[in-house]
């Protein structure tokens, strides 16, 4: 009989094939990408922080994950000795095992605590918590109460972090209600895994929910490029088409109901057709007042706040780029990049940024963004943080305009955009030689991650990193200028 971990059980609930591949076809699994590794690292950091809220515990973390016996024995011993707190208490029973984040004795009660990096309890959290309770109970150590411990996104950092950064929610009732269901599925999955034959499972919404699948590339290999699953905001349409054996966007029948943007996708692929509504585009951009300030923020959004007066997962600006276009065509560039050290030494990089705004922005002319809601919200948050600068910051907000609706609204479409209206989808269609490929930092996620890592690692003097971040952000606003000038030329 195969022994299932908590994560394997969750995989099996998501898809029979996923858990079967975990045991029999690991060769199909793709290497862990940077984004997934970042999620793992975040979970580890939050787990360590949660332990600090229950200090001086015994640590049962296995030294060798292929041999859990020492951890199981230590957990039993410390529980019998009524140790107040145990980290990674390990249990095994009924062909399953689990390692509990925190086992805490609160008076006469024993609490099981599972730690999550989310800001609420998700439905799928009950799956792994219920499995953990099942294993603990059948190992002879049923906790009195089961808690989910997750990030409180209303917590505001002021100096040292406190326990209020976490929320504890009692989910004992839900976990108990799931015990029969856990046993049935554990038995079903165990029996299925005894058969060395790949189970039958069609692709479906479960391939990406509640988690992306490491084997999707294998199960979806029959799906062609430019498939119906690439329809923008497709919802159920792709599955309706798939069930009719219609796989490619260009094969979608004319009488099948599509949105304007989806029609542009189909016509673009079928006829290599570009679309431009000059009147609508002119109506958007011809009203903008010079000089035009093409503006873009870069932000970090750490689960564990690094700057006072910020909340978990709050978008905190650390950089901006600004290209200023005069009516006569003159173009100048301004920029700001905070020192990572200022996020931990008591300095206020956000105040420095606001002061730089005052030097870089004139008192007239529209501020051009790409997705204005993001920049506007950051400016409003800065106004809230610095009341003395609120009038100035709100005056900037009133001048903000947006390039995104031209493409998101389907007023300008190129087949190369596919289902996206992002800068990185639009730019290659307009200026194929102007790319991000020669940059060390090629997207906002990487910029955010690298800057945050420099704060965490105390890497405050890396001039190469600083140069790469500046080049990336400058490229974003210059791309906006190129897109704007292209549109002006087309509507003239």
Q: What are the language-model segments listed below?
A:
Residues 15, 102, 132, 213, ...:
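A residue-level signal for conserved active-site and pocket-lining positions in enzyme catalytic cores
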Residues 1-108, 233, 237-274:
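Metal-dependent nuclease catalytic cores that hydrolyze phosphodiester bonds in DNA/RNA
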Residues 157-225, 244, 426-492:
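Acidic, Mg2+-coordinating catalytic module of metal-dependent nucleases/exonucleases
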């Amino acid at each position: 009989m195969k022994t299932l971990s908590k994560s394997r059980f969750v995989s099996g609930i998501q898809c029979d094939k996923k858990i079967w591949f975990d045991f029999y076809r690991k060769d199909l699994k793709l290497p862990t990408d940077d984004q997934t590794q970042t999620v793992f690292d975040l979970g580890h950091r939050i787990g360590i922080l949660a332990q600090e809220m229950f200090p001086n515990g015994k640590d049962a973390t296995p030294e060798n994950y292929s041999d859990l016996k020492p951890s199981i024995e230590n957990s039993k011993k410390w529980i019998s000795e009524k140790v107040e707190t145990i980290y990674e208490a390990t249990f095994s029973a009924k062909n399953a095992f689990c390692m509990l984040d925190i086992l805490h004795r609160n008076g006469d009660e024993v609490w099981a605590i599972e730690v999550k990096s989310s800001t609420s309890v998700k439905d799928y959290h009950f799956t792994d918590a219920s499995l953990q309770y099942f294993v603990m109970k059948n190992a002879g150590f049923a906790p009195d109460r089961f808690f989910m411990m997750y990030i409180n996104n209303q917590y505001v950092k002021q100096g040292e972090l406190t326990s209020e950064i976490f929320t504890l929610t009692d989910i004992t009732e839900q976990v108990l209600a799931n015990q029969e269901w856990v046993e049935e599925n554990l038995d079903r999955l165990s029996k299925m895994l005894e058969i060395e034959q790949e189970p039958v499972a069609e692709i479906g919404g479960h391939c990406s929910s509640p988690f992306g699948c490491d084997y999707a590339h294998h199960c979806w290999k029959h799906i062609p490029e430019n498939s119906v699953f690439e329809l923008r905001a497709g919802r159920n349409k792709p599955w309706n088409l798939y069930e009719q054996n219609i796989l490619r966007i260009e094969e979608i029948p004319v009488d099948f109901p599509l949105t304007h943007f989806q029609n542009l996708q189909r016509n673009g692929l079928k006829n290599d057709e570009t679309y431009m509504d000059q009147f609508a585009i002119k109506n958007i951009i011809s009203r903008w007042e010079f000089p035009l300030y093409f503006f873009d923020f870069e932000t970090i959004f750490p689960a564990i706040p690094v700057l006072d007066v910020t909340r978990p997962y709050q978008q905190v600006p650390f950089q901006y780029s600004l290209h200023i276009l005069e009516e006569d065509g003159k173009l100048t560039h301004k920029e700001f990049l905070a020192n990572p050290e200022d996020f931990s030494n008591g300095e206020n990089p956000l105040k420095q940024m606001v002061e730089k705004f005052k030097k870089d922005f004139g008192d007239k002319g529209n501020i051009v963004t790409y997705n204005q809601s993001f920049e506007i919200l950051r400016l409003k948050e800065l106004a809230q943080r610095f009341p003395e600068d609120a009038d100035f910051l709100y005056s900037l907000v009133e001048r903000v305009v947006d390039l995104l609706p031209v493409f998101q609204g389907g007023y300008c479409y190129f087949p190369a955009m596919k289902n996206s209206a992002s800068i990185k989808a639009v730019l290659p269609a307009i200026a194929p030689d102007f790319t991000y490929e020669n940059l060390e930092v090629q997207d906002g996620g990487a910029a955010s991650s690298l800057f945050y890592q420099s704060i965490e690692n105390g890497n405050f003097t890396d001039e190469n990193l600083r140069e790469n971040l500046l080049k990336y952000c400058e490229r974003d606003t210059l791309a906006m200028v190129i897109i704007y000038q292209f549109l002006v030329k087309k509507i003239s």
